[in-house]
Amino acid sequence: MLSPKRTRFRKQHRGRMKGISYRGNRICFGRYALQALEPAWITSRQIEAGRRAMTRNVRRGGKIWVRIFPDKPVTVRPTETRMGSGKGSPEYWVAVVKPGRILYEMSGVAENIARKAISIVASKMPIKTQFIISG
């Protein structure tokens, strides 16, 4: 699963997801892509599950690019712990995704295969997405 090798700080504020994505909203590498339509945190497990499903469907010949990276730590407090005594420990990593962001790209396969693979990946994502073609 994806996570940063090292960060300057162990913990982050949650922040808020306002507006749309101005960066990473165009197809750069492949021909087909999966684009987010809603804001969400996408965990490294979800990203990895999508990547595996895509590679399994594309087989050989196709190339895949994962355009998001989980760089935000999410802290969780132990269960049945009283309030106070600091912030919880980092438990997992998420990528902050805004509407318009490209999640995955692929090329080297026919459109019907790409549609099938990307629809399977879309079902693994916690948000509404759309299939787009470059050009």
Curated annotation (Swiss-Prot):
| Alphabetized UniProt keyword annotations | Chloroplast, Plastid, Ribonucleoprotein, Ribosomal protein
- Major localisation: plastid
One cellular component term (GO) for this entry is: chloroplast
| MF terms (GO), sorted A to Z | rRNA binding; structural constituent of ribosome
- Any single biological process term in GO: mitochondrial translation
- Superkingdom to which the source organism belongs: Eukaryota
Q: Where in the cell is it found?
A: Plastid, Chloroplast
What InterPro entries does UniProt report for this protein, alphabetically?
A: Ribosomal_uL16 (IPR047873), Ribosomal_uL16_bact-type (IPR000114), Ribosomal_uL16_CS (IPR020798), Ribosomal_uL16_dom (IPR016180), Ribosomal_uL16_sf (IPR036920)
Gene3D superfamilies given in the database record:
Ribosomal protein L10e/L16
**Family indicated by similarity:** Belongs to the universal ribosomal protein uL16 family.
Instruction: Fetch the PANTHER family from UniProt.
Output: 50S/60S RIBOSOMAL PROTEIN L16, LARGE RIBOSOMAL SUBUNIT PROTEIN UL16M
Oligomeric and partner information: Part of the 50S ribosomal subunit.
Q: What is this protein called?
A: Large ribosomal subunit protein uL16c
Taxonomic lineage is: Eukaryota, Viridiplantae, Streptophyta, Embryophyta, Tracheophyta
